[in-house]
Amino acid sequence: MSETECGRFSTISRETISNVERQLSQPPSVWLNLTGARIIENEGQFDKDIALPNNKSHVTHIAVDIGGSLAKVMYYVCESSSPSSSSSSISEAENYTGGRLSFMIFETAKIEDCIQFMANLIDNHVKNCNKKKITLIATGGGAYKFYDRMSKQLDIKVIREDEMECLIMGLNYFVSCIPREVFVLDLDTCELTFQNHLNCYHYPHMLVNIGSGVSILKVTGPSQFERIGGSSLGGGTLWGLLSLLTPANSFDEMLELSKGGDNTSVDMLVGDIYGKDIGYERFGLKSTTIASSFGKVFRERKPLEEFAPQDISRSLLLAISNNIGQIAYLHAQKHNVQNIYFGGSFIRNHVQTMHTLTYAIQYWSNHTMNAYFLRHEGYLGVFGAFMKYATSQPSNVPVPSIS
């Protein structure tokens, strides 16, 4: 080989070398049969485990999505294992029929609890498998912030994946493969109507992901999307302000407080301005329409302790939900999108939140746009991360890429 020919090797770019190293470090893809998948209905929580009765493969992956407020874990257990126990193995045997996808959620402020949970999963699994075969796929900002800690404490391969790509991939799989996952809310009866993905999953559509903040993604094809907007006023805003204004210690406690609240004791309504039972009919504003969130607080000049925590919680929840709903509508109008999917742990399948978002979309669009929700709305990212390294049946679910 001549000196010139040898010199060609020095022209390989650093980016090319990094790409090759990345491909070599990737774990082998696991097989996951999603045919016949169903949500397990005989459990208390709404974000239930997903049964995979036809999966017979050995699954050695764990996925985690670590956001600013919450960390979500997804893992696979065989059907004989307890889905809620931290001692459950990831996959207990080579020869068994069926299993389930299980989900857990932790506060990011208590990330050590999350890491310990994953460590317990791994330790139990090591009894049946070489630890080197186990891979953690991490996404979200915490995948970078806590990368060194997870790698050191878990002592397994940790791979980081793009947050937005995982969100879209998770949405694709939930909508395409999981029956009774997507639904709409009736504004009059608050009844849920589950959707057939063939009827509702059209392009373009929008994903409004509401976590600590809000990201709005426009999906233009089976594997193309772009981030078109967002807001800093999201779940973290609600959590932070209610931590200051109420005795609630967790997000779920805040949502529970809001269920028993009366926002009219703190919100100024159209009727408070025009007179009781009088609205602004010219613009379709009923007397019960909120004119100013927290508008009565200054006017009444009462100390904080004289306002019920329940009323404050409901008012702030409505304020943030209304704001997100209107922003979502404006982006959908600008980009000519009719179908809007709402995801993220802020929603928590909370009826008042979904009702407010649905009302905002229908009101501002004059009923020309649709608001869709998911039962696993907080797990889009972690599901997408999990499926990044899985070969699935059905095999026609698209893999996203940033536009």
UniProtKB/Swiss-Prot annotation:
Q: Which reaction does it catalyse?
A: (R)-pantothenate + ATP = (R)-4'-phosphopantothenate + ADP + H(+)
Signal peptide location: none
Its Gene Ontology molecular function terms? ATP binding; pantothenate kinase activity
**Its EC number(s):** 2.7.1.33
Which keywords has UniProt assigned to this entry?
ATP-binding, Coenzyme A biosynthesis, Cytoplasm, Kinase, Nucleotide-binding, Nucleus, Phosphoprotein, Transferase
From the Swiss-Prot or TrEMBL record, give the protein name.
Pantothenate kinase
Q: In which pathway does it act?
A: Cofactor biosynthesis; coenzyme A biosynthesis; CoA from (R)-pantothenate: step 1/5
Report any one BP term from Gene Ontology. coenzyme A biosynthetic process
* Function of the molecule: Plays a role in the physiological regulation of the intracellular CoA concentration.
Classification via InterPro entries: ATPase_NBD, Type_II_PanK
Activity regulation statement = Regulated by feedback inhibition by malonyl-CoA.
Q: What class of enzyme is it?
A: transferase
Phosphoserine: which positions carry it?
A: 80, 82, 84
Q: Specify the domain of life of the species encoding this protein.
A: Eukaryota
Originating organism: Schizosaccharomyces pombe (strain 972 / ATCC 24843)
Q: Where in the cell is it found?
A: Cytoplasm; Nucleus
